[in-house]
């Protein structure tokens, strides 16, 4: 069998129903602030200035970086929930309650997150784009000086070889007033499932048991 205790509990919980696990966790979506150290350096800052800070401080720094370099700190897909979800999760909150119902009315954490987002847009610190390709473009072409997303975004950053050595990574900002605010969050991460009517069900289960469910060497390699 598979020893699910070897995985982070939040990864196994999402695939567990009535005490039975239905998936093998794959990657995590640990969220961080990836930032162009060359750009913030031009504005007189280092990565330490952006470490373990609040969103109000991030906005303050963002205004100064924009004024001195002409570069906004962030971009986001207009209407996309990724950044807001990451902010809410950093404070242990969500857009939905445990029953899947909207969790907006009377939710001070949601209100604060939305207010910070709107402030960044209004001040030009965050640039909204139309689609995912444009979002990736703002990172690769140097339109923005940082990105807040799951750790899987590193493949996008590393693909731009001419920016090698220009990026650093640190904690994301935290909400100023939320009681459970932290500088840590998660966005994304996947899992593997075998369909019950798969013609190669036994083979697929055996494959998962001997690869993603047990081999730390495989994870280190990929």
Feature-to-residue mapping (PLM):
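Hinge/lid segment of periplasmic solute-binding proteins
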Residues: 1-32, 59, 168-172
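Extracytoplasmic "Venus flytrap"/periplasmic binding protein-like
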Residues: 1-7, 41-44, 143-146, 160-162, ...
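Short glycine- and hydrophobic/aromatic-rich loop-to-beta-strand nucleating segment
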Residues: 31-35, 88, 192-194
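Extracytoplasmic/periplasmic substrate-recognition and gating elements
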Residues: 43, 123-125, 160-222
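Short helix-initiation/N-cap motifs at beta->coil->alpha
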Residues: 52-59, 127-141
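Glycine-centered hinge/linker elements that transmit conformational signals in sensory
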Residues: 59-64, 100-129, 172
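Alpha-to-beta junction loops
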Residues: 70-71, 141-150
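Beta->alpha turn/N-cap motifs
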Residues: 80, 132, 149-154, 188-190
């Amino acid at each position: 069998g598979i020893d699910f205790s070897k995985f982070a509990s939040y990864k196994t919980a999402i695939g567990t129903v009535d005490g039975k696990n239905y998936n093998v966790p794959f990657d995590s979506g640990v969220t961080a602030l990836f930032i162009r150290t060359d750009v913030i350096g031009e504005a007189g800052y280092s990565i330490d200035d952006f470490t373990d800070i609040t969103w109000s401080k991030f906005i303050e720094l963002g205004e100064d970086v924009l004024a001195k370099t002409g570069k906004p700190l962030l971009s986001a897909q207009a209407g996309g929930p990724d950044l807001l979800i990451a902010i809410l999760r950093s404070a242990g909150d969500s857009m939905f309650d445990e029953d899947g119902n909207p969790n907006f009315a009377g939710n001070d954490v949601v209100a604060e997150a939305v207010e910070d987002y709107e402030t960044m847009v209004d001040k030009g610190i965050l640039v909204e784009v139309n689609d995912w390709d444009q979002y990736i473009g703002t990172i690769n072409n140097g339109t923005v000086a940082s990105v807040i997303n799951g750790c899987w975004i590193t493949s996008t950053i590393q693909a731009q070889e001419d920016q090698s050595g220009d990026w650093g990574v640190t904690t994301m900002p935290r909400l100023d007033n939320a009681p459970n605010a932290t500088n840590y969050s998660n966005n994304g991460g996947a899992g593997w499932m075998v369909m019950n009517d798969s013609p190669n069900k036994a083979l697929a289960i055996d494959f998962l048991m001997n690869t993603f469910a047990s081999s730390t060497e495989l994870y280190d390699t990929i």
